[in-house]
Amino acid sequence: MQTLSIQHGTLVTMDQYRRVLGDSWVHVQDGRIVALGVHAESVPPPADRVIDARGKVVLPGFINAHTHVNQILLRGGPSHGRQFYDWLFNVVYPGQKAMRPEDVAVAVRLYCAEAVRSGITTINENADSAIYPGNIEAAMAVYGEVGVRVVYARMFFDRMDGRIQGYVDALKARSPQVELCSIMEETAVAKDRITALSDQYHGTAGGRISVWPAPATTTAVTVEGMRWAQAFARDRAVMWTLHMAESDHDERIHGMSPAEYMECYGLLDERLQVAHCVYFDRKDVRLLHRHNVKVASQVVSNAYLGSGVAPVPEMVERGMAVGIGTDNGNSNDSVNMIGDMKFMAHIHRAVHRDADVLTPEKILEMATIDGARSLGMDHEIGSIETGKRADLILLDLRHPQTTPHHHLAATIVFQAYGNEVDTVLIDGNVVMENRRLSFLPPERELAFLEEAQSRATAILQRANMVANPAWRSL
């Protein structure tokens, strides 16, 4: 039995009462929160280790509700100025094909270093390069070592609508030197591979790794494939996830919105999490709400690619579970939940011309308890409550940018940078303390970053991508 106690911190619990407890303690035993209280009212039990949280705010770990990890090695140049399909077919797919398993291992470690340093403890990795041999094994080995909580949502594509092909051919003319590649699979092959993946990895790493099926989009996956994913999720008591209405092509092809299309086939259910939802109207929001579908909003990525803004306030008003995802490492170019929270608040204030449309409290909920709800994991993570996993972060607000601070939620959402995250626990294990990562010691960090830079350059060269074009002011 291992015990740990965090003492004299300010707890932002995110429990159903949204209690904020000053000068409080949390007691952790074998990876779970077993007790908490206020020092003036109770005495914490003895512990093997005590973390002094004086001057710090203790929060549930941030939950990255939708992301693509490997593409972090494709950021920093080749994606800029590209719309969605241009970016997808001229950067993402060829870039991932040019990666080797050793590159994937470096990408995962780099991603986790940045994520943990911004307070992210859980990620929903939409693995769209799992088709390539060795990539899954390389990623899982690093996830197990690092200690983050991972939903490994294994994506699959089993059809390409002919109406998209002509558009793709035209876009390829922009980058003729880049090889066109396909990640299509036969439906039966995808089923077998995802089943084997789940059998091997679901519940491993002390229960931190989960495996979901992830049909890519309604236009890239057959109805048969989506029905199988839905049944798989039900039979194995997991979720399934899908990219929905990230571009307007889905509706053009179906002649109706993706939400309407899925409802026609009985594919909307409470185990489904959909990402993006940019090209949505009130009818689509109503359909998702009716079927208790969960949502992940990638607000920075959608803006980066010029796609648009999802109707998040309308979903929130209905009480839907909406989490925040940083999305691709190369369509955001950072893995910083605090930065994405700030952008989420600002863009919706601007779009709605309403300075109170999403409160900082709601934004913080979206990054924690609502993010957990969007993953169907709110019984285990997302709040500081007895019985839940000890995924906790300590923020030190004694920085110039967070001084003065009075309203905690507003300070975190609008003033913080991310470097205020001082200590991170996942399953009660300390994976960062005093900004020092357990899986990337300071004496190794510079050499590792140089290796990541070198590997990224080699990937772009193998894919014939131009990462540093001429200076362009317009």
UniProtKB/Swiss-Prot annotation:
EC class: hydrolase
Regulation: Atrazine dechlorination rates are reduced by aminoatrazine but dechlorination is not inhibited by either melanine or CAAT (2-chloro-4,6-diamino-s-triazine).
Chief subcellular location: cytoplasm
Cofactor(s) the protein needs: Fe(2+)
Gene Ontology terms for molecular function: atrazine chlorohydrolase activity; hydrolase activity, acting on carbon-nitrogen (but not peptide) bonds; metal ion binding
Cofactor: how bound: Binds 1 Fe(2+) ion per subunit. In vitro can also use Co(2+) or Mn(2+).
One GO CC annotation: cytoplasm
EC numbers on record: 3.8.1.8
Site (Major determinant of atrazine specificity): F84, N328, S331
UniProt keyword Iron, yes or no: yes
Gene3D superfamilies, A to Z: Metal-dependent hydrolases, Urease, subunit C, domain 1
Pathway annotation: Xenobiotic degradation; atrazine degradation; cyanurate from atrazine: step 1/3
Keywords from the UniProt entry: Cytoplasm, Hydrolase, Iron, Metal-binding, Plasmid
Catalytic activity from the UniProt record: atrazine + H2O = hydroxyatrazine + chloride + H(+)
Listed transmembrane segments: none
Residues that bind Fe cation: H66, H68, H276, D327
Compartment(s): Cytoplasm
Role according to the record: Hydrolytically dechlorinates atrazine to hydroxyatrazine. Also dechlorinates simazine and desethylatrazine, but is not active with terbutylazine or desethyldesisopropylatrazine. Has no deaminase activity with melamine.
Miscellaneous comment as given in the Swiss-Prot or TrEMBL entry: AtzA and melamine deaminase (TriA) from Acidovorax citrulli strain NRRL B-12227 are 98% identical but catalyze distinct biochemical reactions. Enzymes differ by only 9 amino acids. These 9 amino acid differences between TriA and AtzA represent a short evolutionary pathway connecting enzymes catalyzing physiologically relevant deamination and dehalogenation reactions, respectively. Potential evolutionary trajectories between AtzA and TriA have been constructed, and catalytic activities of the intermediates along those trajectories have been characterized.
Quaternary structure annotation from Swiss-Prot or TrEMBL: Homohexamer; trimer of dimers.
Protein name per the record: Atrazine chlorohydrolase
Gene symbol of the encoding locus: atzA
